[in-house]
Amino acid sequence: MMGYMKTLLLLATLIVTLTTHAKTNLEIIKIGHPTLRATAQEVIHAEISNPEFQSLIDDMISTMSEAGGVGLAAPQVNKSLRMFVMKSWPSVSLTVVINPTIEYLEDFGKKDSVEGCLSIPGKNLKVQRFKKIHLSYFDRKGEYISVELNGFGAIIAQHEYDHLNGILIVDLVEQMISKINYIGFSNAPLM
Ligand SMILES: [Zn+2]
């Protein structure tokens, strides 16, 4: 009987441990918080493999999913690091982007993009984004990746990259037209 109880207790402990470590949802900070306006710091390459950094990546992925977002940048969870995650099934697979650089391919022009921001509740704004970009970064294994992006992937990457430089979508909209711009867009993607 004691052995049975012990096994049960061990099982219960294991389940609690697994569930508490599997995902931690982080607090998403809102406009007005100074971290959103700071220029985020480069991630030291040797630290990418650190368990704490890998946990931060996992926590950001689960926080993004829980919030119904398609992208989330580290400054939005009050970590001033040059890192973001993005995912929008089926067009954008889960991507972890560390220390990115963007080359805006201006020849392909810009297009309107209606966006919501997880750090600006209730405001969907119409901004302009480049149609095509070249994104270079390190993935979560520390490997260097260099890709051309268009479509929704390019939009999310530009939004998240702005977060690393303290730029929010409210900055990209002319003050005079902002009121008009966020009326009527109810289902904009959150990022
Ligand atoms: Zn945002």
Predicted regions and their residues:
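Sec-dependent N-terminal signal peptides
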Residues: 8-16
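Bacterial N-terminal signal peptides that target proteins for export
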Residues: 1-9
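Positively charged
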Residues: 19-191
